Amino acid sequence: MSRVGKKIIEIPSDVTVDIKGNVITVKGPKGELTRTFDDSMSYKLEDNTLEVVRPSDSQKDRTVHGTTRALINNMVQGVSKGFEKTLELIGVGYRAQLQGSNLVLNVGYSHPVEFKPEDGITFTVEKNTTVKVEGISKELVGATASNIRAVRPPEPYKGKGIRYQGEYVRRKEGKTGK
């Protein structure tokens, strides 16, 4: 069994954590994140550490405990270091470009596909075939990258499409003729 909830969260010196009831605000050099958590958890903030304490050992409290600790840790990492996901466009004529802050993808459709970044998300394009999604919220970065990938997911026969960097695409053989 995982013991994620019992780990103490180390808070860097340039990050401040503010706890008001079940609302936690984390401020750092890259920005600020606020989130409301379950009422049952309590928090111990001492020096540069934060500990999440559960009221009992019931199954629900144990699961909420681990999830809460992981989410707070992601908030602390996000405002101090940030998160990024890299996507690769593979296919003839597939390319990405920035128009202002918007991402425009040409991926084999009759029209270009445009993405407007949500608050706290930035796009960078390298070599026309690599897109980086950066931000302070791990959840938002992952969801945005997933939405971009969903425009043209990699297909198994030729491997064309948008994929995460390092993603393995299982290839299939085409049908054999007579």
Swiss-Prot record:
GO cellular component: cytosolic large ribosomal subunit
Alphabetized UniProt keyword annotations: Ribonucleoprotein, Ribosomal protein, RNA-binding, rRNA-binding
Top-level taxon of the source organism: Bacteria
One annotated GO biological process: cytoplasmic translation
Ribonucleoprotein in keyword set: yes
Role: This protein binds to the 23S rRNA, and is important in its secondary structure. It is located near the subunit interface in the base of the L7/L12 stalk, and near the tRNA binding site of the peptidyltransferase center.
Family that this chain belongs to: Belongs to the universal ribosomal protein uL6 family.
Entry protein name: Large ribosomal subunit protein uL6
Organism the protein comes from: Staphylococcus carnosus (strain TM300)
Source taxonomy: Bacteria, Bacillati, Bacillota, Bacilli, Bacillales
Gene responsible for this protein: rplF
